Structures are given as structure tokens and as C-alpha cells.
Amino acid sequence: MKRITTAIVAMVIAISAFAQGWQMPPMPENVVYFEHNFNLGQVEGRSYNHAPTFFIYPDSRLDEAAAKALVEEFDMKDVLVANHAAVFVINPVGEKYDNAADFEAFKAVFDRARSGNLKVVGIGNGATFVNTALAPTDAAGHIAGILTIDGKPGKIPAQSWGVPAYVTGKNAAKVAKPYIAMNKAVQTGDRYVNEEEELLAVVVDTTVGAALAEVFDKAWAELFVKNLRFNNYKHTHYEGAKYGQYGPYELEPYTVHEALGIKREIVKLEQYNGLPWLWYEYWPEELMTDAPAASVPVMVLLHGNTNDPRTQAETSGFIQVAGKERFFVVEMEWQGSKDFGAMGYDGVEQVIGILLAKYPQLDPSRVYAQGLSAGSITATALGIRKSYVFAAVGGNCGGIFSGARRGLFSSYDSLWAEATQKRGAVEMPYCSILGTADLVVPFYTKDNYKGNSFLNAWNTYQQMNGMDVTTELDFATDALFGLELADRQTIVTNKGEGIRMETGYFYKGEKPLIKVVAVVDYGHWNFMPAAQVMWDYFKMFSRDPQTKKLIYHGK
């Protein structure tokens, strides 16, 4: 796990540097005030993932005391604390805003903040700078949302990636027009929305003179909380990136489970020896009491190495899928931490058993598992070790590593031996999602595919499922995968510049028992649209609770 550990250390260093801004190189001189609210360790609330960053451009230059007072006037402290957010108050470089100079200053602060959820607020002349210098340029593709108050309108750019915007105050109707145009938005109720990307929205409030606290409350509730914008293209997001280095950032939903009609329960279970166990339950509210027996599927999420145990719920996309399709989700602290005990494979099974016994509406024939990185490695192993528990398993950015493993991870030889013993007697659907630009758990090329962790995982599932095992690859057959996959498909998304997924299956007879999804030029993280792809695959399968045989329901 050396490479995974190295990546996590890099992420922790990056997070720590961000959270302890005073230890980094000096702030650009025009940053007059900085505040962070990075609170690790609490079980309640949300995780630190995709914490918002606010850039506030005031009407005119402020000193530090006035800048702090401005932040207080917005009355945003509760939002900052609840979301681990940071705020920068950024003066014009000169006495007044100069679009060219202040655009360069914006890039300098952007590079330092390394945010994957940047909200930009402009007031008066600061709003005019935002409207005329940031929104019409490629900066729009780096910003998750804009709040513009009392500014003058910008111009409609010839081409734009768009940016969500809340427009209010003087000239609001005029200021909104370029935002509506660049977002290709049409009026839908009380907002303007891009028909192909609902997160590209514009909200127009023509109220003049409203208190800043009232304005911020509305902007947060109606726009800012809806989405994030981060970049995992051609690198991994926690490594950081400079402005413009990897193109436009991808718009994704900012997970707020309550808005999806989902209630979260936090469960701590004391152990006879050692630390308690921790897990998070996510319930579609109507299913908590009124669902028939054995009617609700179970989706188990497993976080990556040393990640917060809310990571997958908040970043994988599965809560959004559950919001639409109404199934139960549980994310477990499977790995353990300083406060909670490690579950391991047996503990994961025990928690599932506890849930099935406690909630008769849960369906024991439809229990699925997905993980990220080390969680993917664990989900992959669970499908072999605990094949009688799950109807299907899968993961993002992790397979089966060759060589000896330590701690909670099984070795390739051990998993291969068990797969061999079960060959032909046990069938387990497996969905493997990977990023081709992942340097933490790398995808293979024609020069290094032997022993690659993804190919190891596919081979091991081929072995257990009684399928032909593909050990030699031919990249003339398929330039990306080097092997012939059935039902090959290219899915072009509206994320970034059109991030695409390449997919295909390994069949056993009529059953598509292995699905492979390569997110092209993507780094080591969840690609949220892939959650729906995985779920659509999972729901083809169930497992008879008595015989433990796999049931294929067809596509």
C-alpha cells in the first residue's frame, strides 16, 4: 500500500497547508483578511471534503478590521463552520479595481487557495470586477458560484463554460443577462437553468438595499449549496493545480442529503474489547417506517485509506442516486481510526447482519458494496471472501495488488486461492471503475500490464466465476484495454471539457459478470456520474438468501 499511503500523506499535507495558511508562503498583499474553519475529528455534521472557499471582493479597499467587519455583516459564520469553509477578503491591487491587474491577482490567490469549491462574492465595484473580468473569461470554468451585488453588467463572451450565479441589487436584471446567456439557461420557475446541466443556474433578485446577511442566506440556500466545482482531470485533485493548468473544472452536486429527502443516522456500537464501531446510515425518509418487508436494497460504501467515513456518501454520487431511486446507504468506518475500531471483513459482515435484523424492510437478496481506493480494494476482496453476503460488488481506483499485504488487506495469492476453490460454484458480479490518469493506483499500458492491480482483480473474478482468464493482452484489439470487451460503449459526459467513460463487459454465457469502466484522463478519485453507471449494473443482480445462488434479472 506504499503508493496509496504516499498519496494520502500528500493529501494530508495539502489539507494541512490549506488549514494552516500562516505556515504557507505569504498571502498576496491584496488579501486583507483570511479566515479558515477547518474542524477535523467531529462525528456530527459533514466531512471536510469539497469544503467551500469564499473570495469576497469589496466595493473599495478595506483595512483588516473593516474586512473582518464585512465578513461579520454577511453573518456567514454558521455556514463557514458547518462546511469547514475558508474566506478571503481581497482588495483591488491599486486604489481602484483594474481588470488586468486584479485578474492576475485573482490567479495568484486561486493558486494558493487550491479550492475545489470556490464561491466568488462581489459588492459594488467589486461586483463590477467579477462581472466584467472573471465571469466572461475562462475564470468562469474555475468558479463554483458567483454572488454579485449592485455591480455593472459584463459582456456576453463568445464562448464560456458557464458559471452558476446569484444576481441581486441595483441593475440586477441587466447584470443577469450575460450570465443567463453564457449559461445557455432558460427560465424554469423562479430561476434560469441550462437544460443539459441543471447546476448551471442563474437566480435573479431585484431587491435593492437588502442586508448582506439576508442576501447571503438566500444565495447560499438557492445557489451556493447546490454544487461544487473541482478538477480531477489529468491529475488527482488533492495534489493541487495552478490556474488554467488542467482546463475547466467539473460541476458536481454538493451533497446535502436532507435536500434529497434522505435522513442520516449516526451509529456508534460499543465493543467488548477495543474501540467502538462507527457507521452512517442514509435513509430515504419514507422507507424508514412504511416500506414492505425485504423491499429496500442495501448499498454499502467503504472510504479510502484514512479518509473520513463520510467521504463516499458525500463524494461518490451514490447519495444522489439513492435520492432518485430510493435505496438504503450505509458508510462504515471499516478501517478504524484513533477513536473508532477497525471492522475488517468480518466486522463489515456483522454490521450488515445487525442492519438486516434491525430493519426488516431491508432486502437481504440485494446487498451491494462499493469503495474508493483502499475501500475499493476492500470491496473487491469482500466479493470473494464474503460472496454469500453480496449480490454484486465494485470499486473506484483499486483492485488487487500483487505481493504480500499487511493489516486489513488480503494478498493476491490468498484471494486467488479462494477464487480457485470456489471456481464455477460461486458467481459474483464485479464492477471496476478506474481513472486512466491515476498515478496512485495506476492503470496499465502495453508495457506494464503484467501484475497490474486492475487486471489482477478482473482475472480473479474470472477465475471464481468460472470464466476464461485473460492473461495476455493485445492492444491491436482495443487500444485502451488491450482485450476484447463485449458491448463496448463510449459515454461522453457534460463534465469539464466532456470527460468520457469507456465501458464494456466480460460475459459468462448470457450473464455480464464483470463490468469495466475507464474514466479517460481522470485521476485517483470518484467520478460522480459513474455511480449511476455502477448502480444500473448492480440492480441486474440479486442473491437468493437461502441457496446463496446468484440471480440475473437481465439488462
Model-derived regions: residue spans:
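Sec-dependent signal peptide recognition
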Residues: 2-10
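The feature captures the conserved acid-bearing segment of alpha/beta-hydrolase catalytic domains
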Residues: 139-197, 392, 397-510, 524
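Loop/turn elements at helix/coil->beta-strand transitions in domains of secreted/extracellular proteins
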Residues: 49-54, 83-87, 114-119, 139-145, ...
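Alpha/beta-hydrolase
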Residues: 56-58, 149, 302, 396, ...
